[in-house]
Regions:
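A conserved beta-strand-to-alpha-helix junction within the catalytic ATP-binding
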Residues: 13-28
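Short alpha-helical Gxxx[C/S/T] motif in the catalytic ATP-binding
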Residues: 127, 131
Length: 172
């Protein structure tokens, strides 16, 4: 898929799509992995149900699924997804309560075939690279940040602390 995108041979079926539909399908796509890893997946109730973007639903679902899958693989017990519409952009957030990503790994996380420290042995480093290429095609970008208390409306664990990683997918 990534090679086809890079070769510019993919035909996109772009139309207005709801972020809620992308997120729901991505969540469905990773439920078996969540069950296997005993990770709870939740969607922020404060999300904007009417938030939409102009993009290809299939490919955006592929991108978000890859990001959510990564978050689940590195979560301790929970992954949360939110989606919002602002005046200048729309945004999907995916955050977990696992280990943070090192600054060195953040520099390369979207590089094809890059497997950062702490990656499973069977990781080939394509998923996040593919996600970034898809989002970029639709005039977006992905931020990766450490999850801090001020990012969350409430915390992911009982100690009133937040750890983990947050992916912010922003569409302009």
């Amino acid at each position: 898929k990534l090679s086809r995108l890079e070769a510019d041979v993919v035909e996109f079926d772009e139309k207005d799509i709801l972020l809620s539909e992308i997120v729901a399908e991505a969540a469905d796509n990773v439920m078996a992995l969540c069950d296997l890893r005993d990770v709870r997946l939740s969607i922020d109730e404060g999300s904007d149900k009417d938030a939409s973007i102009h993009a290809d639903a299939y490919w955006q679902c592929e991108a978000i699924t890859n990001i959510v899958k990564n978050a689940v693989e590195h979560a301790e017990s929970e992954v949360r997804i939110g989606f919002y519409r602002y005046e200048m952009y729309a945004e999907i957030t995916v955050q977990n309560d696992g280990e943070t990503i090192s600054d060195e790994d953040k520099k390369h996380i979207f590089t094809r075939f890059y497997s950062g420290s702490g990656q499973p042995a069977d990781s080939i480093g394509i998923g996040l690279s593919l996600a970034e290429a898809i989002v970029r095609h639709d005039n977006g970008y992905i931020l990766v940040e450490d999850c801090k208390k001020d990012i969350l409306k409430d915390t992911l664990n009982e100690k009133n602390e937040c750890s983990g990683t947050r992916f912010v997918v922003r569409y302009l």
